[in-house]
Amino acid sequence: MAEAAAGEAGASERDPDAGRARRRLRVLSGHLLGRPQEAPSTNECKARRAASAAGASPAATPAAPESGTIPKKRQEVMKWNGWGYNDSKFLLNKKGQVELTGKRYPLSGLVLPTLRDWIQNTLGVSLEHKTTSKTSINPSEAPPSIVNEDFLQELKEARISYSQEADDRVFRAHGHCLHEIFLLREGMFERIPDIVVWPTCHDDVVKIVNLACKYNLCIIPIGGGTSVSYGLMCPADETRTIISLDTSQMNRILWVDENNLTAHVEAGITGQDLERQLKESGYCTGHEPDSLEFSTVGGWISTRASGMKKNIYGNIEDLVVHMKMVTPRGVIEKSSQGPRMSTGPDIHHFIMGSEGTLGVITEATIKIRPTPEYQKYGSVAFPNFEQGVACLREIAKQRCAPASIRLMDNQQFQFGHALKPQVSSIFTSFLDGLKKFYITKFKGFDPNQISVATLLFEGDREKVLQHEKQVYDIAAKFGGLAAGEDNGQRGYLLTYVIAYIRDLGLEYYVIGESFETSAPWDRVIDLCRNVKERIRRECKERGVQFAPLSTCRVTQTYDAGACIYFYFAFNYRGISDPLTVFEHTEAAAREEILANGGSLSHHHGVGKIRKQWLKESISDVGFGMLKSVKEYVDPSNIFGNRNLL
């Protein structure tokens, strides 16, 4: 098995001359095909490892040079028991008002004067009662690291950086599901990785997989760590050594091909680093999931991710031209970077959505576009959610959707309004009041029924303005009123700070989560209504004293349907086992989604949290096909995170 996994890189190690000949042929063929020359990865890996080990004693763990957003010691920059950066959090200031700390976001340092009242009134929260939680990881509470000494010795000889420290291992034992974060604050996981390894390139990954096969170890890959499907949780009964293979140091753009508008990147690069570096050359991918700051290209591929601007740029399956994955059987990749092939079932679709069960994605070629010259925000207020959905359906039918369009139901609109920062200008405050008066009094909109769509247009300026008029004309036919560019822009600026709200809630006995689905257009309204009602009913039956927050928004539109996001939260004071209540309610909501014609997931993936419904979602035969692929590619279950199957 280990020999099979070695692939071309392993053969090169055994026969250096043959390896050099193969690399020369590959480079030569690349020239003949007009493709960008790829630097010989093996030599580059050796150079990086040599640099990382300079000054280190042979017995020491090599300390590789770092770059990119995510350092090896993630806990130095990011929260170990919550979302995002250490310096950014919502808190109550000395005046009892909510503000966001730090300087990273447009909302940072600003006061949100109405959010406190909204939290109290909506969820029955008493701000005099705070929860207690651990302030740091206690190494003595972490399960001990058990690692084969022969494996460690070979890892050192390969000069691959690693750690067995408790804080490094705990940080990579989880994603960001409510259960995981709650457990971090209150206790400890039953099982965590035994060792964290940091490959710096494709060939390092090949060596790690070879060693795992040789010693029968379990590998769980991790990119940005933003999973919301229990995808990173270690199986409690796994007796083998668990390796957390952290791709964060594989974070380079290897080349940009301006003729074919593609970029070849390492899979550990984060979305924000990728977009920032491409922008320096005048390009972008346009792929912007809400987790853009921390999620990685490899993570996008392995979960079949979607970005908010998919209407222009496509989902991840539309963006990927080529990819490389290391498996226990060897390396999977196509021989051509052609834009489309008719060569049987597309092997890319075995890799996309595989969620770390087959191997490690190491590199990918993705489409890029010139950075748009013009960008404009907008918003539309509708009398109710139903008319808003009808408008979005018509926009999709006419295929004129802007880069992004999101429709909030009334409760989410109210929540968004509560996140509005304090206005310093009397004139601005007066204008806001005038707009509200016009919509509610003059136009007769009920404040408790209003639904709002936020819009983002981008591209050529003249075309954007034409496109904008077309969308607003359609909206008017469904009772929609233009609600201003500022409201639209604020809606999108909140994208990257919403996740921080949950951490504030946890301090005051509020637990919550978001989940998503996709559904045909004719099921959207019924599905939204029934799922929200099911959440309220389940909470009441399970002893939740205050009505839960149960809200939704339509976030993506397609010819044949839409993606819907749900948010729910409740005050758990007085409940002895809040996690059980929460998980039963979330499972009931998923059952309701499936009963109403929704999908198991649109882009979060299956992981372990939704795997119980996978067989009924894809049929017995489809499930058997997935199992057969797994059994062939990974017969010893080296990639043993137990997602999907």
Swiss-Prot record:
Amino acids binding FAD: 221-227, 290-296, 303-306, 355-361
Modified residues (Phosphothreonine): T61
Source species, domain of life: Eukaryota
Biased composition (Low complexity): 1-10, 50-69
GO cellular component terms given for this protein: mitochondrion; peroxisomal matrix; peroxisomal membrane; peroxisome
Pathway field: Glycerolipid metabolism; ether lipid biosynthesis
GO molecular function, one term: alkylglycerone-phosphate synthase activity
Binding residues annotated for substrate, in chain numbering: R502
Residues bearing PTM Phosphoserine: S52, S57
Transit peptide: 1-45
Residues at the site labelled Important for enzyme activity: R406
Cofactor list: FAD
A Pfam family of this chain: FAD-oxidase_C
Annotated stretches, region: Important for enzyme activity: 602-604, 641-645
EC main group: transferase
Assigned keywords, A-Z: Acetylation, FAD, Flavoprotein, Lipid biosynthesis, Lipid metabolism, Membrane, Peroxisome, Phosphoprotein, Transferase, Transit peptide
Role of this protein: Catalyzes the exchange of the acyl chain in acyl-dihydroxyacetonephosphate (acyl-DHAP) for a long chain fatty alcohol, yielding the first ether linked intermediate, i.e. alkyl-dihydroxyacetonephosphate (alkyl-DHAP), in the pathway of ether lipid biosynthesis.
Oligomeric and partner information: Homodimer.
PANTHER family: ALKYLDIHYDROXYACETONEPHOSPHATE SYNTHASE, PEROXISOMAL
Name of the molecule in the record: Alkyldihydroxyacetonephosphate synthase, peroxisomal
Species the sequence originates in: Mus musculus
Lineage, top ranks: Eukaryota, Metazoa, Chordata, Craniata, Vertebrata
Gene coding for it: Agps
